[in-house]
Amino acid sequence: MFLMPTSSELNSGQNFLTQWMTSPSRAGVILNRGFPILEADDKQAATNVSTSFPAKATHFSNSFSISSEEDSFHEEQKLEAGGPYKPWSENPEAPPVFPSVRKEPIASRQDAPGCQEDNNNDLTPHLESEFKEVANKNPLFKKLEQLKEIQQKKQEQLKRQQLEQLQRLMEEQEKLLTMVSAQHAFPGTLLPDDQSQKHRSPGDLTLPPHSYSNPTQENSCASNVLPDEQSNFCRATQDSVLTSKNASDLFYESQYQEAHVKRNDLKEESPAHPSGEGALPRWEKKMGRSQEGKDVNLQKCGDSSEVVNIDERPIKAAVREKQQTFEDYLEEQIQLEERELRQKQLQEAEGPLLAKTKPKQPFLKRGEGLARFTNAKSKFQKGKESKLASTQSPSEDQPGSKVDRQHLQRKTALINKDLCAETPTVKKDSKARPKAGFASLRQKPKVTKTNMRESLSPPGLKVQTGKKRDGQFRHQVKGERNAHASNKENVPACIKPWDAGCKMWSKTQGRERLPLSTGPVGCVVSRSPIRETDRETESSLDFSLQKKLEIWEREKEKENLELDEFLFLERAADEISFSSNSSFVLRILERDQQICDGHRLSSTPVKAVQQREAQQADPRGQSNCSEIPRYGVAHENESECEAMLLSWGSGSPDGLRELSCKRSMKAFQTSTSEIQSQWDARDDGVANSDSSTESEEQHDITIKPSTEVGDRVFSNREDSPQVCDAKGPIRDTGAQEDKWRDADLDLSDKECSSDESVIVESLNNKVLEPLRLPSSQAGSKIDFDDERSWTDLEENPYEHGVIHREEAIYGTPQTQCHSKSEGCVLDKTIKRKIAPVKKGEDFKCDRRISPPPPSDLMVKFFPSLKPKPKLDSHLENESKLNLSQDQPPEFMVCFIGDSVRSQVLREKVTELESEIEKFKAENTSLAKLRIERESALEKLRKEIADFEQQKARELARIEEYRKEETRKLQKERKVFEKYTAAARTFPDKKEREEIQALKQQIADLQEDLKRKETKWSSTQSRLRSQIEMLVKENTDLREEIKVMERFRLDAWKRAEAMENSPKACQYMMATKKDESMNSSFQFQKSHVSSGVQVEKYKKKYLPAQGNLSRRIKSAPPRDLGSSDKGQAALPREPLQQVNFPDLEYKNKEEKEEEIQGEISHPDGKVEKIYKNGRRVVLFPNGTRKEVSADGKSVTVTFFNGDVKQVMPDERVVYYYAAAQTTHTTYPEGLEVLHFSSGQIEKHFPDGRKEITFPDQTIKTLFADGQEESIFPDGTIVRVQRDGNKIIEFNNGQRELHTAQFKRREYPDGTVKTVYANGHQETKYTSGRVRVKDKDGNVLMDTEM
């Protein structure tokens, strides 16, 4: 996609590597350090760019396949390293630019054409060396020859690596497909279809958004899609995918993704999308956008076509990281400049006057003005279609032409700093809008490139969205690709109308896009359009170059930095086979096509020739293109025309062809002559782009005029449908688009080319679904077979310009078209080429703009390159731009001059067509595989859903189980906590001893208390009985008192009577005396006994009532005294006051019984003798003794209530009144005690005691100390003297209690023993013995 560096350039590229890549931290500048031979070959190829295009194309194809992988890897490492390539610019701003490039490698590449971005990593040193050599030497064909030889050498290596890459791609495809599918929606939404188309020129429509001049937008999209590693892989994949059928889709997607990554300014590169899904949707979106045919796309194509110089174009896309780094540097200045550019672009977008002022914009070189417009458009489209364009300034939001200009200015600024300084006049012209883009790029190079990429990628995204609308991402990818190809063809058709005036620019775009789509072959094709574009745009660029020079004077230092950056990017692009081949090869292809316009192998070259003739025949379109003031308006109009053509052509393959014819009306017509004309025009565009690239290297100013020319071409297309419809203008535009596409590819990035090619093939696939499969298959082969691709390009310059870009992306979509039908191929090629043309043109413009004379950029970093490359290439670019603008036929002549190489290219195109057919077949199989995979995925999703449900149920069940277990554990925890708390409360040994002692004390106290309670209860009962007895005695005494009172009264009466009668008185006195004596004795006895009893009990039980007892006790003496006194005739003495009932009873008995005599003893004892012989002795203390008549029975009643009876049988019964106990003593010595509680004790003479308790328990105490207790239930307990206890139960069991153990013997003979330590031993009658410990654990069990 980049112009191939000559061998000398490759050598200088190696020097450049050594000078520039001093450290791996320099991000992505030299991507393929691992392949020094490749770098040398690339350098040599750059040296031989002019001499042998096919060789160089082949070399770049080979080197690209190798270096793309390597380069992407280096880019990633370098980007990660983050070290800016300070050597590139002495200006401190350059390092920030490079760091930004590291951050946004894609953005910097997108400043360069997409192809260049794709290959910049590998080709940047080569491109820079190529620029140096081209600046110093202009033998492009020699360089091409050398490069071809080198490429042939490298092809072997590439082929070897293709297998590995294909395997990697197939593995990564599935991963990336998944990733891309998830990310399609996001990148697709970046920009509206309108803006995406605006960003993409009609040629750019086929190109992925990254192919647009706006690297920022491309980077944004790319970053959205994948990381750098993936994009790097995608680039490598693009090479390998071209060789494999499946890889073709992956490659398309990867390229598109790279473009998308570039749009996002991310280090991540779309190659991670090798799966192709992401790329295809984007191509679909781009296709939709191309169908819309927005003017902005045309304008952007014009802008990108502005980059005519090889230096500018390769520098732009040379190294993504590097450009991004440069963008980082430029971001600050670009932001300021973008503001100005936005205002200028708004003004320019409002009217053709503004568009006309574009050529006057500063920083413009040959083809740089158009590249700016393309960049500005892409940037503007991004601003409109995606919020990613926010980094773009309001100028981006302005009309597509303004935005494209600004965007291209950024590219130009990045590509051509020195050139800007050298050509301030042209820069002024273009700087009206593009300079704002430039300033914004310098200020925010990273953001600007990112915006460019975003603007470019959003269109691609839009195309994807449109394609998604048309069909599924992957399943409809092929159809979408065909539709994209058709749209791209439509776009070229639109481009060619304005290409009449700016044929070189349109071809530059087409070439740039073409390299993106075709890869190396696309690069070759795009290079020829670049030359053609250079010629066309030189006239317009002359005007813009002066203004650029004026502007370059003011910002020369910044432009130098940018130029260095772009040179470095070109060098990297040269190293990148696809990128470098795209631009450089396209220029050579333009030469070849000019030389061999009629030598095309397929009908497409004839159509290209006819288109070229139509372009020549249509001076209006060319004049419009040449008109730089109208360029902005024309570019916008072309964008609109392109959108119209795209929408018109998207309806059917024919419509697509018509759209492509609008870019290239010749291409739209299916006649072989027209096709040849179109191819010739494309060849011219390639040659122009080639020469313009060289002139760009020589003169940075030439870039922007060609961009302006492209804008004018857009305006011409817009102004007159004839331009869009004119086959000649369309063909020229296709060539210009090829140039632009080449330039854009080189400047933008490999990813740009990938996206663009993906779009192209999506259009082509939609237009020619059956053709796409074979072409994709062939493309996979051609992808790495650079020779074959270059040959095809030579055969069909225009077709190659288109197809090679697609092949770079798709493998061989172009070949597919060729194999199916020339018309179809032409249409698809045109579409592809249109998209590529837009990028190629953008790239050419970018080259014209961005790569200042190698003397400027390379002089800073490589003084050796300073003298020749810059002046020669610049002058050649100016002349070529002027020729391309003023004389499209001359470009065609140049292509005819290159007809020889074109013949070779035609042959390669034929090969590519066959490979495209193969790719189409492979795409069909891939579509089936995708359908199967989708069904499998659907099934998997269902299974996943079922599994999720089951998992949810299981989780619920597990959760429920967990909760239940948790509750159980909580309960157990509570129990355990209680247990532990209790365990904590367990006392220690000392405390246990104390507790035991206390318990013992408590037990003792309880026993004492029980004994006391028992005693208290007995005492209480006695006291109650005494109280009752006292109450009764008291009652008796009262009654006795009453009786005695009666006796006293009677005594008074008798006394009175006795006074009357002395005898009676004497008798009565004697009687009274006896009675008184008796009564006194009785009273004394009763009173004393009762009183003594009371006193005794009172003293014993109621000591507090001692006074009462004493009073009672003291009372009897008075009574007795009174009675004694009463004996002396004191009848009034109250003898009756202590009358007891027993006395009364005995008195009654005495009265009843006749008292025989009464004897009073000196001691106070009174003995009464009754007639029945019974004697009663009354003692003074109240004791009474009764003796029976026979003397055997004696009853003694003691004063305390005790009663002793001696029975006739000699039994002695003593009754203890206090204890209510009866003690019976038998003559044989047996003593029986009956207690009040019912207990009975028997004391036997042998000392044995038998106690019968109230419950009928009998306890026997033997004299030897043994005890035997018989309980009511029949249990017998025997206590031995040694303390052992034997218990015999009524059920036959027997227990033995000893101090050491307790044994129980069962009736069946079983013996169970419990020892003091708690062990239990059980012996069974069977002989079994079981021993347990205190806890119940079985220690031994003889039974098995």
Swiss-Prot record:
Task: Spell out the residue ranges making up region: Alpha/beta-tubulin binding.
Answer: 307-382
Q: In this chain, where does the modification Phosphoserine occur?
A: 248, 304, 528, 577, 583, 748
According to its UniProt record, where is this protein located?
A: Cytoplasm, Cytoskeleton, Microtubule organizing center, Centrosome; Cytoplasm, Cytoskeleton, Microtubule organizing center, Centrosome, Centriole
Polar residues: bias regions: 211-225, 388-398
- Output the Gene Ontology cellular-component terms: centriole; centrosome; ciliary basal body; cytoplasm; microtubule; procentriole replication complex
Any one GO BP annotation for this protein? positive regulation of non-motile cilium assembly
What are the recorded GO MF terms, alphabetically? gamma-tubulin binding; identical protein binding; protein domain specific binding; protein kinase binding; transcription coactivator activity
What does UniProt say on post-translational modification here?
Phosphorylation at Ser-577 and Ser-583 by PLK2 is required for procentriole formation and centriole elongation. Phosphorylation by PLK2 oscillates during the cell cycle: it increases at G1/S transition and decreases during the exit from mitosis. Phosphorylation at Ser-583 is also mediated by PLK4 but is not a critical step in PLK4 function in procentriole assembly.
Q: What is its main location?
A: cytoplasm
The record ties this protein, via InterPro entries, to: CENPJ_C_dom (IPR009852), Tcp10_C_sf (IPR047002), TCP10L/CENPJ (IPR026581)
Q: Where is the composition biased (Basic and acidic residues)?
A: 259-271, 282-297, 709-720
**Where do the record's region annotations for Interaction with STIL lie?**
887-1344
Region described as Disordered: 67-123, 187-225, 257-300, 347-407, 425-470, 600-626, 672-735, 1105-1133
Alphabetically ordered keywords of this record: Cytoplasm, Cytoskeleton, Microtubule, Phosphoprotein
Binding partners and assembly: Forms homodimers. Associates with microtubules plus ends; binds to beta-tubulin subunits exposed on microtubule outer surface at its distal tip; also associates with microtubule lattice. Associated with the gamma-tubulin complex. Interacts with the head domain of EPB41. Interacts with LYST. Interacts with CEP152 (via C-terminus). Interacts with STIL. Forms a complex with STIL and SASS6.
What does this protein's UniProt record list under function? Plays an important role in cell division and centrosome function by participating in centriole duplication. Inhibits microtubule nucleation from the centrosome. Involved in the regulation of slow processive growth of centriolar microtubules. Acts as microtubule plus-end tracking protein that stabilizes centriolar microtubules and inhibits microtubule polymerization and extension from the distal ends of centrioles. Required for centriole elongation and for STIL-mediated centriole amplification.
Give the family this protein belongs to, as stated in its UniProt record.
Belongs to the TCP10 family.
In its UniProt entry, what is this protein called? Answer: Centrosomal P4.1-associated protein
Species in which this protein is naturally found: Mus musculus (Mouse)
